[in-house]
Structures are given as structure tokens and as C-alpha cells.
A protein has these predicted regions:
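Hydrolase active-site cap/lid region
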Residues: 125-173
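N-terminal cap/lid segment of alpha/beta-hydrolase-fold proteins
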Residues: 3-29
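Catalytic histidine neighborhood in serine/cysteine hydrolases
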Residues: 218-229
Length: 229
């Protein structure tokens, strides 16, 4: 399933240091509202969601930005060396560099919603809306660690990581990732922005329960809220 050539040209790399470069796609406008898509755990920017959003942004003459965190897709780095703090900081740096002072709507998919919630403390005045798709903030504790059998937990602690099988997927889960997740609590805060917040969640989602999206909505006190199932 080869991507359309025009889209391939939209992928660029931003160099952060000698050893770190992140791949991103964007639709540039100097002074326009942007859509910022933050992908999920082990996802890249060649999936259907970022592609559809890029197409939509072009059609509506909106700015667009999506990135691959380190250890994801074609970005540099090792997945097992990354964590929520690192990936959140990469998203922050990319937004500052590409979007600058423009306003934007955050769109987070799965783990991307966790990364998105971490952006509110930096871009409160620029964020004009938030859309979550199958949102999974704090999933490392709630959906992984708390449910792992003792044997897996022991392996992660003693060896530093373990490969977790989930259906046809395999995830290398490191102990530093789990520990860092505990430092990135976002569901113990309240968000005071008067913006539109929409959570989209599949009723048949077997990985992330709908309760996660409801919980995210409950944290926005002054927002105009909507849950789409």
C-alpha cells in the first residue's frame, strides 16, 4: 500500500542534535489555525488518521502538523529509551518550532491524548480545542502495570524490560517507561479552558475502555464537551 507521491513529499525531518532527528508532516500557513495530530503508542505518521487530517487541512486551508516521537516510525532513537516525558517534550519543541505563535486544535490518538494533555501547561493561550480518539492517558499504569501478572512485573524490574504480546502486536515495555508514566499524571488535574473538547471512542474498543474518554471529559470544567461513541 504505497502512499501517494505528493504526501511522501510532505514528510520532513527536524534535527534536534547530532544524534536526534524527528520526522514530521505539515501543511504550512504563516497565520492560520493549525491542527496538531499526536499519534499513539508505536504509531507513525503514515497511518489513515494523520493522512486524512492532512488532506482535510489542505482542503480547508488550515495549518497541519504531525510528528513521530523518537523511537517511532522513521524518527531516530530507540523505542525502549523513550518515555512520556521525552515524547511530550518533543511534541512541545516541534509545536514551538513549526507553529510558533499560531493557534491550534490538539488531536490525540490513544497515547497521543496523554501527550496532548501534557501540552496544556505550555500552550494554554494557543490551544483552541481538543479532540481525543480512543484516548488512553495514564494507560501504562491503568491498562498495563496494574494488569500484568507478577511474572511479567518481575521480569520488567529485574531485566529492565519485557516483550508484551497483545493480539498480533508485540510491545517492548521498559521499566523506565513504566516509572516515568507515574510521574506524568494528567488525570489528577482540572483544566479550566473554555474550549470545545470532543472525545471519540469506539464502543467495541477492546484495548482502551470508553471510561477513559469519560474521565478526560470530566477534567475539563469550563469546556463545551461532547462524547461521540
Amino acid at each position: 500500500n504505497k502512499l501517494d507521491e505528493p504526501y511522501m513529499k510532505k514528510f520532513k525531518f527536524l534535527k534536534f542534535s547530532k544524534s536526534k532527528k524527528l520526522r514530521y508532516s505539515h501543511n504550512y500557513f504563516k497565520e492560520r489555525l493549525y491542527l496538531v495530530f499526536l499519534p499513539g503508542f508505536m504509531s507513525d505518521i503514515e497511518g489513515k488518521k494523520p493522512m486524512c487530517l492532512l488532506k482535510f487541512a489542505k482542503k480547508k486551508k488550515l495549518g497541519f502538523l504531525s510528528l513521530e516521537y523518537s523511537g517511532h516510525g522513521k524518527s531516530s532513537g530507540f523505542f525502549t529509551k523513550g518515555n512520556i516525558s521525552i515524547w511530550s517534550n518533543e511534541a512541545k519543541a516541534m509545536i514551538k518550532k513549526i507553529i510558533k505563535k499560531n493557534n491550534f486544535i490538539l488531536i490525540g490518538s490513544s497515547m497521543g491524548s496523554w501527550i496532548a494533555l501534557n501540552q496544556f501547561k505550555y500552550f494554554n493561550s494557543q490551544i483552541k480545542g481538543f479532540i481525543g480518539i480512543g484516548s488512553a492517558p495514564e494507560f501504562l499504569k491503568r491498562l498495563m502495570w496494574d494488569k500484568f501478572p507478577k511474572k511479567i512485573k518481575r521480569e520488567i524490574v529485574t531485566k529492565g524490560k519485557a516483550v508484551i504480546k497483545n493480539g498480533k502486536y508485540e510491545y517492548p515495555i521498559s521499566y523506565q517507561l513504566i516509572k516515568n508514566g507515574r510521574e506524568n499524571r494528567v488525570l489528577n488535574r482540572k483544566y479550566n479552558l473554555k474550549i470545545n473538547v470532543t472525545m471519540i471512542h469506539g464502543k467495541k474498543d477492546e484495548v482502551v475502555p470508553v471510561s477513559f474518554s469519560r474521565l478526560v471529559l470530566s477534567k475539563f470544567i469550563k469546556a463545551k464537551k461532547k462524547l461521540v461513541l
